Amino acid sequence: MSGFTGAGYPKAIPPALARHIEQSNQEGGQFRIGVWTGASTAPELDGVLAQAHGIQMRLPYQSDPSCRQLINAGQMLYTDMHLSHVAQFAWFGFLGKLDVAVVEVVGVLPDGRLIPSTSVGN
């Protein structure tokens, strides 16, 4: 997901995704995702997904108490790397396959180009 501080991360997708994860888990499934961001986000992303037990792996930086608790309990994988290394690691495939990217934008131009918010940080 895009994210570089609390100002620039998707606002609507994480809570909706957390609800979907909780429902899946209640039905016996185990739906979890990897969360890669440019930096820290906010409780409305990390917190809601962690509380839903929906994050399998988090990188490169997080500051959420719910995430920290799961990381320290060994229930969430965490890779603590310098922010500047994430893009290169992703490009070279060291982090595995990226299936979906969620990026916060403030607008879409008529030709389809996106206008990113402050979410573009790395």
Specify the residue positions occupied by each region the protein language model found.
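Conserved alpha/beta enzyme-core scaffold
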Residues: S2-N122
